[in-house]
């Protein structure tokens, strides 16, 4: 049996997440450390207003902290992953779980990343469900203002680009459902190149250890442990596509049998059910999930 720990990204947050973890010493210590770095309380933010929690500059640090705590609690119970991966923001949690950087370094990176993404303006993102694949591929070929931002599953993708470009694709591609996303910019596209420049410099200057277990990155989901290579992939992430469908397929091909979503919600296990039905799925999002292991 080989287990992959996968960490969700923005969109998995929910009011009340992570509060039950406070009964553990590991969580208390991490929440205190996070407050010193962020200047605000993750626990209070997670117990507050839904609209405030949904702001990129709040969501991303909160998710990273909670996912890091859950990974620590799993290890404290004697569990170890054979592989790790994370969806967009979740890649930072995966790198922490693989020992590429420590908790504080990861949170400082996530804080800056969230501020860069929150301040991005212009552009649009939209999710398409049960869409005509041939139509979409042709539309993306014809429309240079839009890219495939998240290839989540055979039935779900996210596109990103100019407002006019995204709206044109939504109007011309048949889909069971198409939902514009409530985000400030065209994330995971070349439109993030300018705002992400300073953050890329921060990442370049940051030391990355070699990973203790193979990491499957968003922009290139081949198993990698070399710290410098993992850094290169992370630098490309904000402007590159999240190749999540390939990540799930690759996990199965390299021998993963169990797929644990470490973080709030069930977004990633939901995607995996449709793409790789043979994998054993488990959600580790709260204390009850840990206690049931």
Swiss-Prot record:
The keyword Lipid metabolism applies. The active site is at residues 88, 188. The keyword Transferase applies. It comes from the Bacteria. It catalyses: holo-[ACP] + malonyl-CoA = malonyl-[ACP] + CoA. Its EC number is 2.3.1.39. Keywords: Acyltransferase, Fatty acid biosynthesis, Fatty acid metabolism, Lipid biosynthesis, Lipid metabolism, Transferase. One of its GO terms (molecular function) is [acyl-carrier-protein] S-malonyltransferase activity. Pathway: Lipid metabolism; fatty acid biosynthesis. InterPro entries: Ac_transferase_dom_sf, Acyl_transferase_dom, Acyl_Trfase/lysoPLipase, Mal-CoA-ACP_Trans/PKS_FabD, Malonyl_CoA-ACP_transAc, Malonyl_CoA-ACP_transAc_FabD, Malonyl_transacylase_ACP-bd. GO terms for cellular component: cytosol. One of its GO terms (biological process) is fatty acid biosynthetic process. It holds the Pfam family Acyl_transf_1. PANTHER family: MALONYL-COA-ACYL CARRIER PROTEIN TRANSACYLASE, MITOCHONDRIAL. NCBIfam families: fabD. Belongs to the FabD family. This is Malonyl CoA-acyl carrier protein transacylase. It comes from Synechocystis sp. (strain ATCC 27184 / PCC 6803 / Kazusa). The lineage of its organism: Bacteria, Bacillati, Cyanobacteriota, Cyanophyceae, Synechococcales. The gene is fabD.
């Amino acid at each position: 049996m080989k287990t992959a720990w996968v960490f969700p990204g923005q969109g998995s947050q929910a009011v009340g997440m992570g509060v039950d973890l406070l009964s553990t010493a590991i969580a208390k210590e991490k929440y205190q450390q996070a407050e010193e770095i962020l200047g605000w309380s993750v626990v209070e933010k997670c117990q507050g207003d839904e609209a405030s929690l949904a702001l990129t500059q709040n969501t991303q640090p909160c998710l990273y902290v909670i996912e890091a705590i859950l990974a620590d609690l799993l290890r404290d119970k004697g569990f170890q992953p054979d592989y790790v991966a994370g969806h967009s923001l979740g890649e930072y949690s995966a790198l922490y779980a693989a020992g590429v950087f420590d908790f504080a370094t990861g949170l400082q990176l996530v804080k800056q990343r969230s501020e860069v993404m929150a301040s991005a303006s212009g552009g649009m993102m939209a999710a398409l469900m049960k869409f005509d694949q041939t139509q979409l591929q042709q539309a993306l070929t014809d429309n240079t203002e839009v890219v495939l931002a998240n290839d989540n599953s055979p039935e779900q993708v996210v596109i990103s680009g100019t407002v006019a470009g995204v709206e044109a694709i939504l109007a011309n591609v048949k889909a069971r459902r198409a939902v514009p996303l409530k985000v400030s910019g065209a994330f995971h596209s070349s439109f993030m190149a300018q705002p992400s420049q300073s953050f890329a410099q921060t990442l370049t200057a940051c030391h990355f250890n070699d990973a203790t277990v193979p990491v499957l990155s968003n922009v290139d989901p081949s198993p990698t442990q070399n710290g410098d290579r993992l850094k290169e992939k992370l630098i490309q992430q904000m402007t590159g596509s999240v190749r999540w469908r390939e990540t799930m397929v690759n996990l199965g091909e390299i021998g993963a049998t169990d797929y644990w979503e470490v973080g709030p919600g069930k977004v990633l296990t939901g995607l995996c059910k449709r793409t790789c039905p043979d994998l054993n799925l488990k959600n580790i999002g709260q204390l009850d999930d840990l206690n049931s292991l």
